Amino acid sequence: MMQIKVFCMVVLCAFLFIACEKDNDDYEPIKPPVEQPEEPVKPEKPDEPEKPEKPTTPPATDDIINVKIGDSNMIVGSNNWNAITYGNGKYVAVGEKGYVTMSTNGVDWSTPKQVGSKVWHAITYANGKFVAVGGSGYSGQKAFVTYSTNGIEWATPVSIPSLYGDLCSITFGNGKFVAVGYHEYGGREYRYVSTSTDGVTWTSAIKIGEDTGTQLMSVAFGNGKFVAIGDGYATTSENGISWSSLTRISYDSFYSIIYAKDKFIICGSNTVIYTSTDIITFEQRFAKPGTSSLISLLYDNGCIVALRKNGYYLLSSDGINWSEPAQITDESGKVVTAMLNGVCAMP
């Protein structure tokens, strides 16, 4: 039995731990048949019909590790936290009004400090640095980036050249950081990307396509490609600079993308989940029309977690078969009503 711990970022500045259990982790890839030499005197036997593959069972959702939401040491600051990441033995969370906080154990957190005064939307750890991206949340004002090597001391935020909007997501791959977002101008929205090899110096924003009212909400790297998504569209790049035309996948809004189990996994409104192995063909794997949006995805230790903003989560071991949405509860069994913003794996 394999178990991973997951750390959820809550809008109301509380924190939750949940564990996801993968019951069937011993599946082996199907081995190709080995041809045998024909016997000279015996007639050939007819081919046997192929046997259907054993269906994959989604991970169990009955092993929840709960904490008391009201514990004073789990209330951090007085502003909303938007994103969290883990790196170099530390958890770092970022949020509204430029605030950041750090913890080495997920329980005891540093006093929140302001790094600039903007909204930090996303953070990642790669290449020896924590790098956070965000903006003002208002049209006509620039997007910003900051970085830290220890999660405590932060560089003065710098603006992204030519980008008057917000950066919503950041990833690292192929030797560079890639951040995506949008630029509002004259009441129109344009999709933009900026890249950096060191997290310090950033390229001028690159526009992707023309105005379609589409924002780029999330970006991931896998199988040699960057893939950015938003508002039901996807675009791809091998170098983070030249991007494909926007492809319509769905009329649902998209909020998060990851690469796991040899495929890209996308989630969004109406609890929708799509997968693709080639970024050409996309298959819908889950949906519940009229329900809350899935806003974050996580892959760790063989388990995939999809998180709803309203406190529900889904689990999968392959990205194809998913458990039914389950509610996060506190240690007394009461449903958690705080709104969630993100999720992070714990070692």
Feature annotation, model-predicted:
Residues 2, 28, 39-42, 48-51, ...:
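Short, low-complexity interaction segments enriched in Ser/Thr/Pro/Gly
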Residues 59-347:
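Residue-level hotspots at or immediately adjacent to binding/recognition sites across diverse folds
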Residues 1-18:
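Sec-dependent bacterial lipoprotein signal peptides
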Residues 5-6, 24, 78:
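Generic extreme N-terminus detector
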Residues 14-69:
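Bacterial Sec-dependent N-terminal signal peptides
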